Curated annotation (Swiss-Prot):
Its EC number is 3.6.5.-. Residues 584-586 form a propeptide. It catalyses: GTP + H2O = GDP + phosphate + H(+). Residues 1-309 are annotated as: GTPase domain (Globular). One of its GO terms (cellular component) is membrane. Pfam families: GBP, GBP_C. InterPro entries: G_GB1_RHD3_dom, GBP_C, Guanylate-bd/ATL_C, Guanylate-bd_C_sf, Guanylate-bd_N, P-loop_NTPase. Its main location: membrane. Residues 35-276 form the GB1/RHD3-type G domain. Induction: By IFNG in endothelial cells and in LPS-primed macrophages. This is Guanylate-binding protein 5.
């Protein structure tokens, strides 16, 4: 079962010391332990605008993230709070509170943009917190960070000036939730009441025209529209009387403005129900461990002066996870074989059957824990390792069988060898007695269980090594005529040749069996690779269809908003005309 992490308080995830970013290892360890999918909500905005208050509410607490009550910025770097998702079982809600932008104590805004960019890259829902109204400054700031040619790269391409496919680019970005604090304006456009979402869409609507002034006005709006096809806007009244704002986090709800309390409730409800699980290109679901790796990749890139590249981050993540998936698969194989196999195995087929079962389970473990292994390089690596494992277990089985059989022969034939040394068979009729005893001991050897596949091989080698002993006894046997001795020698030779032929035939059968097993393994690997490829292609198709549906929905929403705006303009124009009509008296 996926592990659920409970953090009683937030902690720093990315430290910002002297405008240098550094990852907090303790926070990374917490992320590593989260095996559940994560919903990542990050908030960014100017300092002293109440970001931390909203994040505390999302955590279901009044206190946690530092809420400032002075003109200095409190939160430094990026802080994290992992809590159980209130709506989705087996999901973890990861809240990221960021250092306030625009701190006058900073030398320039480079550090601000780095923190802004990290929040964008890590989140599945990005909360942009501004004050009073949507103005050009807020739009320009959001545009400056989201513009790929300035800071973010979707692909690892040297051509940073090429135009990105809007659907492709948008898939890398989170959903946008724009929060307007201390909103005191009327939600009205051209005399018509509008919703916060309509107010946002109107603020981002480009103007008609082609002169430079219009282009400068439209560029950031088009960029935001492209990168954030899914947008939501919330407005918040002033929470309480000015004198009480310094104690905002300690004020009970009944001392806050009712409208503000209701607005915060609606905001939290929307985040809980609409914020999606963090996913990467290709539909890769992010858990705590993957989020940790993304943090490391992005911070290292920014700290080294490189552009954070989403494709590189995904590839680096795939490298780490697929390499770990290979190790998990091999560990599972070793565990299963260790439990099932007792060397020596009686037959090669029995051993190969156990290998085949453990191999299939190992591949399933790999497929479950790997992702984006597009060229199957890691699966091929696993197959190479499994092939080596098969060769090794077969070799060890041979050695175990040989060792066991050698020890068994020593135990069974030891008394006979001692009798030969004492000259018991060096007498008339001794050779027949020796052969008779040898056959009895061979029968005893054959009756012993669990000798393994080297039983005949080891026996024949042993008997061959004792041919000189048999020949010496035969030569000293005075009871046999010369003709009988030659006949005996021919008989012994024929039996030895027959045994050698049987030994070679057994080796040939084993080799053929191993070749057939390797061919079967190859065909199974090809089949598994084809399944993995088809699954990946199906996932890509699913993602493309989902993107097209989202684009269509966005276009429909935009079209409807434009129609409403046009209708409002027409109605306003009609009222103006009616008001200007002259009154004619007859």
């Amino acid at each position: 079962m996926a592990l659920e992490i409970h953090m009683s308080d937030p902690m720093c995830l990315i430290e910002n010391f002297n405008e240098q970013l550094k990852v907090n290892q303790e926070a990374l360890e917490i992320l590593s332990a989260i095996t559940q999918p994560v919903v990542v909500v990050a908030i960014v905005g100017l300092y002293r605008t109440g970001k931390s208050y909203l994040m505390n509410k999302l955590a279901g607490k009044n206190k946690g993230f530092s809420v400032a009550s002075t003109v200095q910025s409190h939160t430094k770097g990026i802080w994290i709070w992992c809590v159980p998702h209130p709506n989705w079982p087996n999901h973890t809600l990861v809240l990221l509170d960021t250092e306030g932008l625009g701190d006058v104590e900073k030398a320039d805004n480079k550090n601000d943009i780095q923190i802004f960019a990290l929040a964008l890259l890590l989140s599945s829902t990005f909360v942009y917190n501004t004050v009073n109204k949507i103005d050009q400054g807020a739009i320009d700031l959001l545009h400056n960070v989201t513009e790929l040619t300035d800071l973010l790269k979707a692909r690892n391409s040297p051509d940073l000036d090429r135009v990105e496919d809007p659907a492709d680019s948008a898939s890398f970005f989170p959903d946008l939730v724009w929060t307007l604090r201390d909103f005191c304006l009327g939600l009205e456009i051209d005399g018509q009441l509008v919703t916060p979402d309509e107010y946002l869409e109107n603020s981002l609507r480009p103007k008609q025209g082609s002169d430079q002034r219009v282009q400068n006005f439209n560029l950031p709006r088009l960029c935001i529209q492209k990168f954030f096809p899914k947008k939501k806007c919330f407005i918040f009244d002033l929470p309480a009387h000015q004198k009480k704002l310094a104690q905002l986090e300690t004020l009970p709800d009944d001392e806050l403005e009712p409208e503000f309390v209701q607005q915060v409730t609606e905001f939290c409800s929307y985040i809980f129900s609409h914020s999606m699980t963090k996913t990467l290109p290709g539909g890769i679901m992010v858990n705590g461990s993957r989020l940790k790796n993304l943090v490391l990749t992005y911070v290292n890139a920014i700290s080294s002066g490189d552009l954070p590249c989403i494709e590189n981050a995904v590839l680096a993540l795939a490298q780490r996870e697929n390499s770990a998936a290979v190790q998990k698969a091999i560990a599972h194989y070793d565990q299963q074989m260790g439990q099932k196999v007792q060397l020596p195995m009686e037959t090669l087929q029995e051993l190969l059957d156990l290998h085949r079962t453990s191999e299939r389970e190992a591949i399933e473990v790999f497929m479950k824990n790997s992702f984006k292994d597009v060229d199957q390089s890691f699966q091929k690596e696993l197959e190479t390792l499994l092939d080596a494992k098969q060769n090794d277990i077969c070799k060890r089985n041979l050695e175990a069988s040989s060792d066991y059989c050698s020890a068994l022969l020593k135990d069974i034939f030891g008394p006979l060898e001692e009798a030969v040394k004492q000259g018991i068979y060096s007498k008339p009729g001794g050779h027949n007695l020796f052969i008779q005893k040898t056959e009895e001991l061979k029968a005893k050897y054959y009756r012993e269980p669990r000798k393994g596949i080297q039983a005949e091989e080891v026996l024949q080698k042993y008997l061959k090594s004792k041919e000189s002993v048999s020949h010496a006894i035969l030569q000293t046997d005075q009871a046999l005529t010369e003709t009988e001795k030659k006949k005996k020698e021919a008989q012994v030779k024929a039996e030895a040749e027959k045994a050698e032929a049987q030994r070679l035939a057994a080796i040939q059968r084993q080799n053929e069996q191993m070749m057939q097993e390797r061919e079967r393994l190859h065909q199974e690997q090809v089949r598994q690779m084809e399944i993995a490829k088809q699954n990946w292609l199906a996932e890509q198709q699913k993602m493309q269809e989902q993107q097209m549906q989202e684009q269509a929905a966005q276009l429909s929403t935009t079209f409807q908003a434009q129609n409403r705006s046009l209708l409002s303009e027409l109605q306003h124009a009609q009222r103006t005309v009616n008001n200007d009509d002259p009154c004619v008296l007859l």
